[in-house]
């Protein structure tokens, strides 16, 4: 509880150029509480993976099961660098065509993420549908 700040203290700690930037940051911070990140050491991938359930309040419900991968190979979490990708036998990046040029990682790294999703599809879908806990997810994930 000691990390809770008043709104004006929060604003003073940050450097926002616009109100939209502030609102997007607050939204993103709230979203983070509802997502679990999976490190490169756990997945064997070059990128950090983010998982969430379909009961995420801040983002609304999605029809298509998805995870997100970090759009770089940094070991530091960068929440503004997340790319959604479907959980399926043939995972698809869920960006509009004109946004695909924003992808910074290599095609080989994207293919590795897709193979990892296929290998872990069952447990990822169970987590998406809230049929398993985060602890169980981490125990059952395969590299």
Feature-to-residue mapping (PLM):
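Short coil/turn linker and secondary-structure boundary residues
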Residues: 2, 17, 27, 105-108
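A short, structured beta-strand/loop element
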Residues: 45-111
């Amino acid at each position: 509880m000691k990390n809770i700040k008043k709104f004006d203290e929060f604003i003073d700690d940050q450097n926002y150029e616009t109100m939209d930037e502030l609102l997007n940051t607050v939204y993103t911070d709230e979203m983070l509480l509802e997502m679990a990140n999976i490190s490169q050491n756990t997945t064997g991938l070059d990128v950090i993976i983010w998982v969430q359930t379909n009961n995420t309040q801040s983002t609304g419900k999605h029809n298509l099961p998805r995870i997100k991968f970090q759009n770089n190979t940094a070991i530091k979490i960068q929440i503004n660098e997340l790319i959604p990708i479907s959980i399926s036998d043939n995972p698809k990046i869920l960006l509009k065509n004109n946004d695909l040029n924003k992808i910074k990682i290599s095609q080989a790294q994207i293919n590795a993420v897709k193979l990892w999703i296929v290998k872990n599809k069952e447990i990822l879908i169970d987590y998406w549908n809230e049929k398993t806990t985060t602890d169980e997810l981490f125990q059952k994930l395969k590299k």
